[in-house]
Amino acid sequence: MPDPMRSYLDFEKPVAELDSKVDELRAMAASGTDIGEEVSRIEEKAGQALADLYANLTPWQKTMVARHPQRPHFTDFVNALITEFTPLAGDRKFGEDAALLGGFGRFRGEPICVMGQEKGATTESRLKHNFGMARPEGYRKAVRLMEMAERFGLPVLSLVDSAGAYPGIGAEERGQAEAIARSTDACLALGVPNVAIITGEGMSGGAIALTTANKVLMLEHAIYSVISPEAASSILWRDGTKAQEAANSMKITAQDMLRFGVVDTILKEPVGGAHRDPAAMIAATGDAIAQAFDELKGLDAAAIRKQRRQKFIEIGRKLS
């Protein structure tokens, strides 16, 4: 059987079957049967099948990869990349929102402000973090963090992975749209460098609120859009089952975003996606973060704001 801890996506069935065959052969080898060459041959075949599959993913398949439950999340990146991390809680207006986490720590020895959505990894943690869908208090906490970062002259790092802001009645009553707008404005107004990375899903205003940054990076199989494929399908076709068709038409991939000038850099993922080797993906992300901030060193507050403003103006010109 394939690794019981690994979740295979529907389109990965051929790879799962080969992995299962490898495990069967290894079990036979453990009993004394000499089949080392056969195991190596099947392993090589499985590796090639995986590489071929991921070299030609459709937008809908990338959507499935971006949502993979074993993909590294905010806490994984923070635990690996940030030392002396001190989380902050609450928006000083309503309460705490566990869907959007943030705080201060050190990145490669330098002080930094970090924030982002956390989806959770277990049933209990997913419910606690509301599947990464932040409420107004989450975005107001983000504004609070950014204001503190500017006050202390600290760079800001945003890790984005969310299906969107939470659309519940309570969230709307507490001013969800206003909170998203305030967070977006706070990002744009920062006088310190900010870097945003879309690690999985970057959906709607819930993502935009943290990604109006000097540098926007995106993992190879992440997605970024104003609306989820399912929601677009329901609106355009009045049929939620056409999500695959919607995804294939919406231009949501990292490659699309780079072509449009929406993101600056694509971070290559391990063969088979970030979920197959989270440690390698996190290490590569750390290097990309360091490079992005290095490119912004030496700029004063006015130059930082000008660069960021010009970046987003150019996006509009490219798309017009």
UniProtKB/Swiss-Prot annotation:
The keyword Lipid metabolism applies. GO terms for molecular function: acetyl-CoA carboxylase activity; ATP binding; carboxyl- or carbamoyltransferase activity. GO terms for biological process: fatty acid biosynthetic process; malonyl-CoA biosynthetic process. It catalyses: N(6)-carboxybiotinyl-L-lysyl-[protein] + acetyl-CoA = N(6)-biotinyl-L-lysyl-[protein] + malonyl-CoA. Transmembrane segments: none annotated. Pathway: Lipid metabolism; malonyl-CoA biosynthesis; malonyl-CoA from acetyl-CoA: step 1/1. GO terms for cellular component: acetyl-CoA carboxylase complex. Its EC number is 2.1.3.15. It is an enzyme of class 2 (transferase). It holds the Pfam family ACCA. It comes from the Bacteria. The keyword Phosphoprotein does not apply. Keywords: ATP-binding, Cytoplasm, Fatty acid biosynthesis, Fatty acid metabolism, Lipid biosynthesis, Lipid metabolism, Nucleotide-binding, Transferase. Belongs to the AccA family. Component of the acetyl coenzyme A carboxylase (ACC) complex. First, biotin carboxylase catalyzes the carboxylation of biotin on its carrier protein (BCCP) and then the CO(2) group is transferred by the carboxyltransferase to acetyl-CoA to form malonyl-CoA. HAMAP family: AcetylCoA_CT_alpha (MF_00823). Acetyl-CoA carboxylase is a heterohexamer composed of biotin carboxyl carrier protein (AccB), biotin carboxylase (AccC) and two subunits each of ACCase subunit alpha (AccA) and ACCase subunit beta (AccD). This is Acetyl-coenzyme A carboxylase carboxyl transferase subunit alpha. It comes from Bradyrhizobium sp. (strain ORS 278).
